[in-house]
Amino acid sequence: ETGGKIEILIEQVLDDQNALAMIKSSKKINMDLKIILSNNYVVQILERRENLFLIQLNQGSFHELMELNGHVPLPPYINRPDEIDDIKRYQTVFAKNKGAIAAPTAGLHFSEADFELFHRNNINYTFITLHVGSGTFQPVKVKDIDQHIMHTEQFEITNETKIKIELAKKNGGRIIAIGTTVLRAL
């Protein structure tokens, strides 16, 4: 509506038309602001929820909108626009479910060949789903770490994965978490 620049980082898709998002704007963000995007998509800001905004889409779904207009949210230390190769470069080879706004970086170095090697050497592994949120980008801003408010994270651990982990522990095996987000989830 105002012609200003705006960046929307979808934190969580609630349903096809509603999502929670971080919004950066060159101008003040007012409630009920309508953001007009390409292909006749209009996003309306409904309310503020702490550091996020509840936004509503006028048509289609947020997943469709992200496929058409979305960009890979690169880590802040990478100071360049995203490229088409970033879609694969910043995603783990074992990613299956949508929902994270950033890759769980500890797993980025694994390749299909690594998992083939694990299999050939009878090294058991299993997966959990991490929905890494925007809090992963938030710095600690307080001197006393006990005063830092930690962000929440969503994850999914299937019953099959739970059984594999319990069996490994029962048999004296080691459980090695790849990354701090996995460690917190376990």
What is each residue range found by the language model?
Residues 1-186:
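Surface-exposed, charge/polar-rich loops and edge strands
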